[in-house]
């Protein structure tokens, strides 16, 4: 069940205390993820966008790697049982809004729910309503126009904003591979490069055989 972490006995206690007070305690890692198998299977299958699928796998991996469910609350570390998603949605007038959706392990159920949330955001009143008080999410953004190699996010909540932020870019082709630019930004008081490495390894592992998960 959701609970607060006992930081007094946490192996990272001193690291946590050190980075918690930084003005900018975030670090960002950019890489390229091989989505060749995912794209090929979805072309054969039809009916599901690649974007919807990579949101699912990025969120599933985040739920499996426990520190991605840590959040800072009043200087304490809160641990969510499950974290959900929110993503940017481009509007017809070229402004953007946000869509929020729940994580569900079943692929088809997730795609249905997230797809409805995104469509409702796209066809709604276009109002920009960020849920600043909802930290039980991963913040996603999609830039399908840019194969980026570096990325940083705008932030305005001081050093207590501990929600991981993930960006997806424009596919790039290299030899026979289809590569997805991928950025993950996290709070250093809550995790280190080792944690992000485990997250990326798990994500890559799932994307080698995505059909196992649907």
Where in the sequence are the language-model features?
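Flexible, Gly/Pro-enriched loop and linker segments at secondary-structure and domain junctions
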Residues: 1-30, 51, 128, 135-179
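Aromatic-residue-lined binding/catalytic grooves and analogous aromatic/hydrophobic interfacial grooves
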Residues: 2-5, 29-37, 44-48, 61
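Acyl/amide activation-and-transfer machinery of modular secondary-metabolite enzymes
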Residues: 20-41, 82-105, 179-185
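Short amphipathic alpha-helical segments
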Residues: 46, 50-53, 106, 110, ...
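Hydrophobic "lid/gating" helix adjacent to the active-site nucleophile
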Residues: 48-85
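Generic non-transmembrane alpha-helical segments
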Residues: 57, 61-65, 117, 202, ...
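Helical lid/core segments from catalytic subdomains that handle acyl or acyl-like groups
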Residues: 91-148
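Active-site-proximal acidic secondary-structure segment that organizes catalysis
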Residues: 108, 120, 160-214
């Amino acid at each position: 069940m959701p609970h607060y972490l006992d930081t007094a006995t946490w192996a990272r206690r001193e690291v946590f205390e050190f980075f918690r007070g930084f003005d900018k305690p975030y670090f960002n890692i950019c890489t390229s993820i091989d989505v060749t198998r995912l794209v090929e299977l979805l072309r054969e299958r039809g009916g599901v966008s690649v974007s919807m699928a990579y949101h699912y796998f990025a969120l599933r991996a985040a739920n499996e790697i426990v520190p991605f469910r840590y959040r800072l609350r009043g200087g304490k570390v809160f641990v969510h049982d499950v974290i959900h998603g929110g993503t940017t949605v481009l509007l017809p007038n070229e402004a953007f809004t946000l869509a929020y959706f729940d994580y569900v392990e079943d692929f088809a159920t997730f795609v249905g729910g997230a797809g409805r949330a995104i469509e409702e955001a796209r066809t709604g009143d276009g109002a920009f309503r960020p849920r600043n008080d909802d930290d039980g999410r991963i913040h996603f953004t999609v830039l399908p126009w840019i194969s980026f190699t570096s990325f940083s996010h705008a932030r305005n909540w001081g050093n207590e904003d501990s929600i991981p932020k993930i960006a997806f870019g424009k596919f790039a082709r290299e030899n026979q591979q289809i590569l997805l630019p991928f950025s993950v930004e996290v709070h250093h008081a809550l995790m280190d490069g080792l944690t992000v490495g485990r997250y990326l390894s798990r994500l890559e592992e799932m994307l080698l055989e995505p059909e196992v998960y649907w």
